[in-house]
A protein has these predicted regions:
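Cleavable N-terminal signal peptides of Sec/SRP-targeted secreted and luminal proteins
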Residues: 1-18
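C-terminal accessory segments of proteins
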Residues: 17-382
Length: 382
């Protein structure tokens, strides 16, 4: 009987143990890059609360129109493995999407994304272990710079940055990108607990007070642009960025409370008061989204390669949750409607494709508007 109890206790607590690192993932010898190196081209301007309240938005890119083609030309090219052709990718994606929609007309088991403070220690550790698992796995070969499967996600974001920032596709693409991340954690690394998100309104102006940024979990934020040397991502090696260049460096942060103060309820509510999708999305991008990135700073302030900091996905869970609240406030009408344009000036439509370069099947915008629909099948705990 004592043996059975001891075994049950061990099984119940096993998720509390941190996953060990593969040698690829960390490198204490890598330097922190000067902060000015992370001041890469931005595709949307920062919005103050007053600007958000007055109806302004961030749709005006900080890149001059004449410089945009040059910015795009510097973005790395996707490398497709030799055993895959564009023709069979298209066919496979079409078949996969059709099959998915046929087999899952309804979402019968909605997953709940849980806010960090509401999650158990076992769920926190399980989530971090799954991320470290991706960082330990070898890359797919799609992106030559990648050292791990997690790096592939960073390479994907870097490659598509000019297409999915500074336009109305921003919230939609990042919704599917974050879902792709979750799907990889579950399918490739066995995550069984919830995907976590960070309610930044609770720590606006004081991110360091969140246990996320502690030596127990994701490491310190008040490191003045230097390498994060504590927590479970200490000495993390990053091959991507800054910008569209790739200079190996460490995970660095540079907390700025004068910026994170702008992730509070006031600016979230101001953006969510907009009635048009594209107007709300532009406000959200330059509002809490941009202030959160720049407030954490260093790696997170680099638009292209910011997913190199694992906090990226906690942050984008927050942004997606705010988007979902805007949808909820408009009833079913906002689950079947978009407006605005993409990076090429094409009007968004419900049948426009959202792609993640084969990481997961291409979807249509209509497939991902309802997070509780058959494609995504998730909701937030509040």
């Amino acid at each position: 009987m004592h043996f059975l109890l001891a075994t049950a206790t061990l099984v119940a607590s096993c998720n509390a143990f941190a996953l060990p690192w593969d040698k690829r993932a960390t490198d204490p010898s890598l330097p922190a890059l000067p902060l000015e190196h992370f001041n890469t081209p931005k595709f949307a301007r920062l919005l103050t609360l007053d600007q958000a309240l007055s109806g302004q938005n961030a749709s005006v890119t900080t890149i001059k129109p004449e410089d945009l083609p040059d910015a795009k030309s510097q973005t790395p090219t996707l490398v497709i493995p030799k055993n895959i052709t564009l023709e069979n990718i298209t066919g496979a994606v079409e078949h996969a999407v059709d099959s998915l929609l046929e087999k899952r007309d309804t979402c019968s088991n909605v997953r709940v994304r849980v806010e960090w403070d509401s999650s158990s220690d076992n769920d926190k550790q399980g989530y971090i272990n799954a991320i470290k698992c991706l960082m330990n796995k070898p890359p797919s070969g799609q992106f030559p710079v990648s050292k791990s499967r997690y790096d592939d996600l960073v390479g994907l974001h870097q490659t598509l940055t000019p297409n999915v920032h500074g336009n109305a596709k921003f919230l939609l693409w990042h919704r599917y990108y974050t879902w792709t991340f979750e799907s990889m954690l579950r399918d490739e690394c066995g995550l069984t607990g919830p995907l976590l998100w960070f309610d930044e309104t609770r720590y606006a102006g004081n991110f360091a007070a969140s246990s996320i940024f502690s030596s127990r979990w994701m490491g310190s934020i008040n490191v003045g642009g230097n390498c994060v040397t504590d927590g479970q991502f200490a000495n993390l090696a990053l091959p991507y960025g800054p910008g569209s260049s790739n200079t190996p460096h460490c995970l660095a942060r540079n907390n700025d409370d004068s910026k994170t103060i702008n992730t509070g309820n006031s600016i979230v509510d101001a953006c969510n008061s907009r009635s048009d999708y594209a107007d709300m999305a532009a406000c959200a991008e330059g509002g809490a989204h941009a202030w959160g990135h720049n407030g954490i700073g260093a790696v997170m302030s680099d638009v292209y390669a910011s997913p190199g900091d694992p906090v990226f996905f906690l942050h984008h869970g927050f942004i997606d949750r705010n988007f979902r609240i805007w949808q909820n406030n408009g009833g079913n009408a906002r689950l079947g409607y978009v407006d605005g344009t993409d990076s090429q000036g094409h009007a968004l439509s419900l049948d426009m494709t959202v792609n993640v370069y084969g990481f997961r099947p291409d979807v249509r915008i209509r497939d991902i508007l309802d997070t509780r629909g058959s494609t995504l099948c998730y909701k937030y705990n509040y």
